[in-house]
Swiss-Prot record:
Residues 28-80, 101-143 are annotated as: Disordered. Coiled coil: none annotated. It comes from Avian sarcoma virus (strain 31). SUPFAM superfamilies: Winged helix' DNA-binding domain. This is Transforming protein Qin. Gene3D superfamilies: Winged helix-like DNA-binding domain superfamily/Winged helix DNA-binding domain. Keywords: DNA-binding, Host nucleus, Oncogene. Residues 108-143 have a biased composition (Basic and acidic residues). GO terms for cellular component: host cell nucleus.
Length: 387
């Protein structure tokens, strides 16, 4: 009987152990283990035989651990994300793998991009500035092709009163030519030198009633035939034929308008405008020059007394408001200084070709006054020629 029981026990135990280890969880295995131990306690002989043919119970946890390892192997592998430091290290390794040539190429690409950005910004700035000035290139303004004399003449001719102070000339040039806003010291000195040396520019003293400082600069009337050359942009003088036509037109204009003296009481200097019509309100007749030369002074004409024309008789006698007359002038009753002033004023108010009899022995020829170039020359004793 014992042999049969042993054989049956041997046949059954491997099946139970195999099914428990592979199909049942650990908790069920522990329960089964407790039940199996209880069964072995009832059959000590069988327990002895089981202990002889099967491994001890402590081997079961090892089998459970092996099963857990198998489950872990079957599960998908989940790797943690790489750290930032690892990424940088990988990039550095990649660059190192490229070698020095790769690094140099990358630097060149960066430089080209930066240069293109700068160029685009510069072009945008230039477009904005070109709409305003249109002369700026490479960050600097182009120098205008005009000479300093031409710039001065443009400034004076475009002024309303045909005269400007030195500062007024500077302001005109800087306003119309942005190139001269820089390096003021150099070109301003050149402007002063050209004003002093060129005979086309005449200095006019400022009237004492005129506030401000600095003298005025005007164009000499003889410079009317001066123009700015189109090729050299320098001052040029018209040909003789052109000057004759200009003088003829000027003489016709003066004849039609008429020139006489105007009262300006209390004035010591009289800056005359070239196109100012001089007419005395109390003159009984209008006297004008019949010549074709310039009949107006560009310099201020000093005089100490105001001349008024009371009447023009058949004997062509002129008198002044303060009692000055040609007779007194010739007879020496007037001081020498007043003699020059009065003679010049009287001669300027008499048309050319008209002789003024003086005490029956002398005649006054007004054409001896040199007004052709705008220079006022006064009478000397040689201006009085005996008849």
């Amino acid at each position: 009987m014992l042999d049969m029981g042993d054989r049956k026990e041997v046949k059954m135990l491997p099946k139970s152990s195999f099914s428990i280890n592979n199909l049942v969880p650990e908790a069920v295995q522990s329960d089964n283990h407790s039940g199996h131990s209880h069964h072995n306690s009832h059959h000590p002989h069988h327990h002895h035989h089981h202990h002889h043919h099967h491994p001890p119970p402590p081997q079961q946890p090892q089998r459970a651990a092996a099963a857990e390892e198998e489950d872990e192997e079957k599960a998908p592998l989940l790797l943690p994300p790489p750290a930032a430091g690892a990424l940088e290290a990988a990039k550095a390794e990649a660059l190192a793998g490229k070698g020095e040539a790769g690094a140099a190429a990358a630097e060149l690409e960066e430089k080209e991009k930066a240069a293109e950005e700068k160029k685009g910004a510069a072009e945008g700035g230039k477009d904005g500035e070109s709409g305003k000035e249109g002369e700026k290139k490479n960050g600097k303004y182009e120098k205008p092709p005009f000479s300093y004399n031409a710039l001065i003449m443009m400034a004076i001719r475009q002024s309303p009163e045909k005269r400007l102070t030195l500062n007024g000339i500077y302001e005109f040039i800087m306003k119309n030519f942005p190139y001269y806003r820089e390096n003021k010291q150099g070109w301003q000195n050149s402007i002063r030198h050209n004003l002093s040396l060129n005979k086309c520019f005449v200095k006019v003293p400022r009237h004492y009633d005129d506030p401000g400082k600095g003298n005025y600069w005007m164009l000499d009337p003889s410079s009317d035939d001066v123009f700015i050359g189109g090729t050299t942009d320098k001052l040029r003088r018209r040909s003789t034929t052109s000057r004759a036509k200009l003088a003829f037109k000027r003489g016709a204009r003066l004849t039609s308008t008429g020139l006489t003296f105007m009262d300006r009481a209390g004035s010591l200097y009289w800056p005359m405008s070239p196109f100012l019509s001089l007419h005395h309100p109390r003159a009984s007749s209008t006297l004008s020059y019949n010549g074709t030369a310039s009949a107006y002074p560009s310099h201020p004409m000093p005089y100490s007394s105001v001349l008024t024309q009371n009447s023009l008789g058949n004997n062509h006698s002129f008198s002044t408001s303060n009692g000055l007359s040609v007779d007194r002038l010739v007879n020496g009753e007037i001081p020498y200084a007043t003699h020059h002033l009065t003679a010049a004023a009287l001669a300027a108010s008499v048309p050319c070709g008209l002789s003024v009899p003086c005490s029956g022995t002398y005649s006054l020829n007004p054409c001896s006054v040199n007004l052709l170039a705008g220079q006022t020359s006064y009478f000397s004793p040689t201006s009085l020629t005996p008849q």
